[in-house]
């Protein structure tokens, strides 16, 4: 049965931490938002409460009587002023009134002094001719204003213009009359001058007669001038009533002065000179009046022009919209009124016509009825004589009887309004109306019998009136129905308009959502591209070579997860245990499993549980600190009591000898007393070797760590990557292949987890290819460079074939040193792994200086190597019985108890010794776990002693030792290794001698020490796994040292097993010979190279050759050897490179000749960084700022808000990176012009910094800052990626985001680089 659990192992710790931080950040944001909303709610509540209290206080406020009286008086005064203003407006707009605007605008009075000789004239009446007044116009205007006040408001300006034109015309007429009068007076003056005598010596009679004549003439002239002055006074009085009041007393004074000489009975004698003077005075007065009238006329003209200009340019103010709407309503009501009147007239006309027709029909029926009655009387006498006559009379009666009355609609020509109304009405509605009216008329049909019963004409008239009233009611219903339908139509029109507006709004919103979704899709595509690159990286990291062996079985790629089954086989309880019991199994994060309750006796079990184990960092940590916990419980009445506990370790699954299954037994001791409670035999099996799953997991971890590779189109920071330049110059020796000269070739290189790079196919040997690979600055990169290689393939362009001709594999270790590079001409190998005549000229060099973390400091003294990520779990220190791991075949179950070896007495000997360490734990394995993919610096092999009486075990041991290779890994002594080094002749005697030299001296060999004392010598050396053998409880096992000792030791040591010295020496020589033969075979017959896509990028060990079947000892037990990670060679990237041997001289690399293709900028000195470059200029121009629809910054538009723009550019100070202050937009979607330009002149250091910014795609960020009294607040921010092609003065629109990442505004700016700066950057 498979236990259910949560997939915790699928979640890495960074993912869990990221998820936790995201959740915490969202929680903080939500709390901030809740606090802000609570503040807003509190503010709204306080405002609402304040407004309610103010309204309540205003309602409950008691006004004093005196204040109320004062307000009433003020209202009355205002009403009086309003009436006066209306009266003045009516006087001003009346046609007979004189425009007062002239005098008001000029600021002077139009009052003039009339001449003293003029006399007062009564005011002109309505019938007087020559007056400008039109008395009948005022009542008509008042009537019109009373009848349609709203229409008067619409046409008051036009009427004022018309009245001013009329007044101007009248004034022109007055001017012409006055001119005519002046001309007449001039003629009289000239005639008087001609008729006056030359001498004044005349008789009294002549003087009297002349004086009387002159007086009479003067009186006539005075009367004419008086009439003219009164006429002008009348005009001025009508135009300015206020001035007229002022003129009245002066007129009285003139009258009195004029009448005083008339009261004198005897007038004074006049002389001709006085008459002439009077005429001249009158003439001057008339001229003055004329000039004043002309000035008034000019003023009236100017006022008229102003009014016309104002009426044309005046906008709709002072309720113009309301007046226009009221005018429209008035016009609509007038149209409805006219239509209603027309309908009433038409209905009256139809009623009269119907009444006439019905009267004619009634008379016709009455006459017919009378004639039929008379005929019936005549025929009644003859009816008795003949039956035939009676029938004939009846027929005549029937024939002469009038037909039944049926209503036929009167067909007439409809009016235009009826036709239009009928077109608008529905056909169904008209048909229904026709049927109802027809039914009413049919119900009022009159027969002959009913006509006889009719009385006087009053009854008939009442009946027709009733019929008309019913028809009228039906028509009213139809009219109301049409009105209701009209209202419904209007409402539907309004709804359609609202829906249309909503549709436009939704279109705008959908366009915004579409733009946002498009951006999200682009971001998602970028993420997909990144994931594809990561998948490709993982895929290339797990490639395996295709081995050209016919009998090799294709083993599928191991999975990261495997099925772990635990089977309990047999239980043997102690005699002291008498109660029933059961076991519980707990492993990792899986569900707790329990066995059935069993009796206290020895018996076999058949209990199996299966765990689906997924390899992860958490599982590795668990295996290092824990195992499968088995607890023994005793059931009670209402609870369970813990009796004993133990822990099963899974470290045997990581051994080379155990592939998929092993069985052992464990002792469970009491948790209270430590007494043994039972012995449990178990079996553990996995679906596939768990070591393969760990290898796969480690490879995926390595690939995941190498994921941050810089892509071609990716914008990443240069500070996290260091470029490595790979240049392939030429291929030497192509002509030796004997190929056609037209054959095309190309070079393919495979480097780490990067995609294979193909050069262009060409027939020339000159390749001239260059490639930059960006290496992440992480620790795993250094490890990969120390243990990996780069592969080059010469490929021929052959259709449907791989076309691989030659290969070359170079280790990357020389690149890890200071100034390290790989350059020169290297010979290539053919497909069979033999040297060829083709060489490849190439160069691998860092673009900049080698990264500092690549440099590995050499320790002066050998120190213990500390691994980064231990993969094998540490031993678990738990009290349990020693056990023996027994190999079990796939189809076989072992139920028998494990057998123990007989103890051996210790004997002193000089042979190589080994010691077994005794531990009370269930897992006595390596004290320090090693990384599967981090091989030790000096890998060593360890031999375990076997009984001398069993030669089969000796052979098996020898075969196991043959699988191991001993060689030194002096990485620092080799700069570059060519593939030719793999064909060097091996020296069989050097490897064992080298190994013997590297073995510790007798003085340095660790001695056995007391188990209670710490083993100090073991701390500086690597610990090796040691097996446990099953022994009896009474046997004692002494600790032994896993390391090899020299043949001759100065002090004897106790050992578990003893052998003769001759046997030991023979065995040692045999082991050395086997190691030498294995090394020769590995160096001599190397596997060929497959096509490029199958060449591995991940580590490949030399020990991955098909292993021979290991023989099992006679005891049926497995002997543990080296841990898994010791079998991995130092170089994991190539299966063709031979082990590096320190005794051989390194292969010298020739210097690369030719021009360098890498452009490296020289480093700047501290003095050069501050040198100013006058041609290197960058200008930043801020153009416009605009709020987007629905922005949360809209409330700031109602305030007088000012703000400025701040940005960060290179290393300029904050004062040099801010704009001037400008105003905030006054309404949404209003564009504010900033028009601010900032120009920078760069130094050499700033130029280098700008180049780094552009290469790393660092964003140019801007911040919008609001200026508040005493404080500044950030409203939003935007960013722009710098590119070296900003010379075209392009305007960029930057979205301004708030803290929540929502777009609030848009800002337009221009970024311009000078031409010299562009040339320097590119």
From Swiss-Prot:
Residues 224-234, 956-975, 1042-1067 have a biased composition (Acidic residues). GO terms for cellular component: ciliary basal body; ciliary transition zone. Residues 195-217, 918-927, 1127-1139 have a biased composition (Low complexity). It is found in: Cell projection, Cilium. Expressed at the transition zone at the base of cilia. Expressed in ciliated sensory neurons, including the amphid neurons in the head. Disruption phenotype: Defective cilia sensory function. Abnormal dye filling (Dyf) in the ASI neuron and chemotaxis behavior. Shorter cilia lengths in a subset of ciliary neurons. Aberrant localization of other cilia-expressed proteins. Residues 108-119, 1015-1029 have a biased composition (Polar residues). The keyword Signal applies. One of its GO terms (biological process) is protein localization to ciliary transition zone. Residues 15-89, 274-362, 456-538 form a coiled coil. It holds the Pfam family C2-C2_1. Residues 984-996, 1068-1080 have a biased composition (Basic and acidic residues). Residues 108-151, 189-275, 392-418, 891-1094, 1121-1149 are annotated as: Disordered. Its main location: other. Thought to have an important role in cilia formation and cilia-mediated chemosensation. Involved in the docking of other MKS/MKSR proteins localized to the transition zone of the cilia. Belongs to the RPGRIP1 family. An X-box element in the predicted promoter region was identified consistent with other cilia-related genes. This is Protein fantom. It comes from Caenorhabditis elegans. The gene is mks-5.
């Amino acid at each position: 049965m498979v236990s259910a659990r949560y997939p915790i192992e699928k979640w890495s710790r960074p993912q869990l931490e990221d998820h936790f931080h995201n959740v915490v950040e969202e929680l903080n944001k939500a709390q901030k938002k809740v606090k802000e909303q609570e503040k807003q709610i509190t503010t709204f509540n306080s405002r609402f409460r304040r407004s309610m209290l103010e309204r309540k206080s205003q309602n409950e406020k008691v006004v004093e009587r005196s204040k109320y009286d004062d307000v009433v008086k003020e209202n009355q005064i205002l009403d009086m002023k309003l009436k006066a203003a209306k009266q003045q407006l009516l006087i001003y707009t009346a046609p007979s009134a004189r425009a007062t605007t002239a005098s008001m605008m000029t600021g002077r009075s139009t009052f003039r002094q009339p001449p003293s000789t003029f006399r007062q004239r009564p005011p002109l009446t309505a019938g007087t001719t020559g007056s400008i007044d039109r008395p009948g116009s005022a009542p008509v205007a008042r009537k019109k204003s009373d009848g349609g006040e709203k229409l008067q408001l619409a046409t008051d300006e036009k009427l004022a213009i018309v009245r001013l034109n009329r007044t101007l015309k009248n004034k022109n007429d007055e001017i012409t009359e006055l001119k005519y009068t002046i001309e007449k007076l001039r003629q009289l003056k000239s005639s008087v001058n001609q008729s006056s005598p030359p001498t004044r010596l005349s008789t009294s009679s002549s003087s009297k007669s002349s004086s009387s004549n002159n007086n009479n003439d003067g009186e006539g002239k005075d009367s004419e001038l008086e009439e003219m002055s009164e006429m002008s006074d009348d005009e001025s009085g009508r135009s300015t009533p206020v001035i007229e009041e002022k003129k009245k007393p002066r007129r009285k004074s003139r009258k009195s002065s004029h009448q005083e000489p008339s009261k004198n009975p005897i007038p004074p004698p006049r002389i001709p000179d006085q008459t002439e003077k009077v005429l001249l005075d009158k003439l001057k007065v008339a001229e003055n009046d004329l000039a004043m009238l002309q000035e008034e006329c000019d003023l009236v003209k100017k006022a008229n022009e102003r009014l016309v200009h104002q009426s044309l340019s005046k906008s709709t103010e002072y309720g113009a919209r309301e007046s226009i709407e009221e005018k429209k309503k008035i016009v609509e009501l007038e149209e409805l009124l006219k239509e209603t009147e027309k309908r009433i007239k038409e209905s009256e006309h139809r009623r009269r016509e119907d009444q006439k027709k019905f009267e004619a029909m009634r008379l016709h029926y009455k006459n017919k009825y009378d004639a039929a009655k008379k005929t019936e009387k005549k025929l009644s006498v003859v009816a008795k004589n003949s039956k035939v006559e009676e029938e004939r009379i009846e027929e005549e009666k029937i024939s002469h009887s009038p037909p039944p009355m049926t209503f036929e609609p009167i067909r007439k020509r409809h009016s235009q309004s009826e036709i239009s109304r009928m077109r608008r009405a529905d056909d169904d509605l008209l048909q229904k109306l026709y049927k109802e009216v027809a039914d009413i008329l049919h119900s009022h049909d009159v027969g002959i019998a009913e006509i006889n019963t009719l009385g006087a004409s009053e009854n008939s008239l009442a009946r027709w009136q009733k019929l008309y009233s019913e028809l009228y009611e039906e028509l009213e219903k139809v009219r109301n129905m049409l009105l209701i339908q009209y209202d419904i139509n209007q409402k539907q029109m309004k709804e359609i308009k609202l829906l249309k507006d909503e549709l436009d709004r939704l279109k705008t919103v959908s366009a915004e959502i579409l733009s946002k979704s498009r951006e999200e899709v682009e971001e998602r595509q970028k993420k997909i591209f990144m994931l594809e690159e990561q998948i490709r990286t993982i895929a290339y990291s797990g490639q395996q070579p295709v081995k050209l062996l016919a009998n090799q079985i294709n083993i599928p790629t191991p999975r990261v997860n495997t099925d772990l089954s635990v089977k309990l086989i047999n239980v043997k309880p102690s005699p002291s245990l008498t109660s029933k019991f059961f076991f519980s199994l707990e492993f990792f994060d899986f569900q707790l499993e329990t066995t059935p309750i069993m009796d206290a006796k020895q018996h076999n079990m058949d209990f199996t549980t299966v765990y689906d184990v997924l390899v992860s960092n958490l599982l590795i940590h668990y295996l290092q600190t824990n195992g499968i916990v088995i607890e023994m419980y005793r059931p009670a009445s209402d609870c369970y009591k813990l009796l004993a506990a133990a822990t099963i370790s899974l470290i045997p699954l990581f051994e080379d000898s155990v592939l998929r299954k092993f069985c052992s037994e464990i002792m469970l001791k009491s948790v209270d007393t430590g007494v043994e409670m039972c012995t449990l035999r178990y079996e553990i099996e996995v679906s596939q070797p768990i070591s393969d799953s760990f290898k796969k997991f480690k490879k995926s971890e390595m690939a995941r760590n190498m994921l941050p590779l810089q892509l071609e189109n990716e914008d990443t920071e240069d500070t996290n990557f260091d470029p490595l330049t790979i240049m392939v110059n030429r291929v030497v020796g192509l002509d030796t292949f004997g190929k056609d000269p037209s054959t095309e070739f190309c070079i393919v290189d495979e480097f780490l987890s990067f995609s294979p790079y193909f050069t262009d196919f060409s027939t020339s040997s000159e390749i001239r290819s260059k490639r930059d690979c960006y290496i992440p600055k992480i620790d795993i990169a250094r490890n990969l460079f120390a243990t990996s290689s780069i592969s080059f393939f010469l490929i021929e362009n052959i259709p449907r074939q791989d076309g691989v001709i030659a290969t070359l594999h170079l280790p990357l270790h020389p690149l890890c040193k200071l100034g390290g590079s790989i350059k020169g001409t290297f010979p290539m190998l053919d497909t069979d792994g033999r040297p060829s005549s083709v060489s490849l000229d190439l160069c691998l060099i860092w673009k900049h200086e080698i990264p500092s973390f690549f440099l590995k400091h050499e320790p002066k003294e050998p120190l213990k190597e500390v691994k980064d990520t231990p993969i094998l779990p540490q031993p678990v220190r738990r009290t349990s019985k020693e056990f023996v791991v027994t190999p079990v075949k796939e189809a076989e179950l072992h139920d028998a108890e494990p057998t123990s070896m007989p103890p051996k007495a210790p004997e002193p000997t000089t042979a190589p010794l080994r010691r077994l360490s005794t531990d009370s734990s269930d897992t006595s394995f390596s004290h320090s776990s090693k990384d599967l993919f981090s091989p030790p610096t000096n890998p060593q092999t360890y031999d375990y002693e076997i009984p001398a009486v069993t030669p089969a075990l000796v052979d098996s041991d020898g075969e196991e030792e043959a699988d191991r290779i001993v060689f030194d890994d002096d990485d620092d002594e080799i700069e570059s290794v060519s593939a030719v080094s793999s064909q060097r002749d091996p020296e069989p005697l050097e490897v064992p001698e080298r190994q013997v030299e590297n073995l510790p001296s007798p003085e340095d060999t660790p001695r056995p020490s007391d188990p209670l004392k710490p083993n100090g010598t073991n701390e500086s050396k690597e610990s090796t796994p040691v097996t446990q053998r099953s022994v009896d409880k009474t046997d004692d096992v002494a600790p032994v040292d896993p390391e090899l000792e020299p043949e001759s030791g100065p002090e004897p040591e106790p050992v578990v097993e003893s052998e003769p010295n001759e046997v030991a020496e023979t065995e040692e020589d045999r082991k050395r010979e086997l190691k030498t033969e294995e090394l020769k075979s590995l160096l001599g017959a190397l596997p060929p190279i497959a096509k490029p896509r199958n060449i591995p990028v991940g580590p490949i060990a030399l020990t991955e050759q098909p292993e021979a079947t290991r023989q099992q000892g006679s005891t049926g037990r497995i002997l543990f050897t080296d841990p898994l990670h010791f079998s991995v060679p130092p170089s994991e990237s190539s299966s063709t490179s031979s082990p590096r041997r320190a005794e051989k001289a390194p292969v010298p690399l020739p210097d690369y000749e030719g021009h360098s293709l890498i452009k490296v900028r020289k480093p700047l000195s501290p003095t050069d960084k501050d040198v100013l470059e006058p041609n290197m200029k960058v200008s930043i121009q801020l153009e416009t700022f605009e709020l987007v629809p629905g922005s949360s910054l809209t409330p700031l538009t109602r305030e007088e808000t000012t703000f400025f723009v701040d940005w960060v550019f290179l290393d300029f100070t904050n004062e040099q990176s801010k704009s001037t202050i400008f105003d905030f937009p006054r309404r949404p979607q209003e564009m504010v012009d900033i028009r601010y330009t900032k120009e920078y002149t760069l130094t050499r250091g700033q130029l280098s910094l700008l180049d780094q910014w552009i290469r790393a795609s660092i964003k140019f960020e801007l911040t919008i800052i609001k200026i508040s009294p005493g404080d500044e607040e950030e409203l939003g921010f935007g960013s722009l990626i710098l590119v070296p092609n900003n010379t075209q003065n392009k305007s960029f629109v930057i979205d301004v985001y708030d803290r929540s990442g929502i777009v609030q505004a848009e800002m337009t700016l221009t970024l311009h680089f000078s031409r010299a700066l562009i040339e320097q950057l590119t």
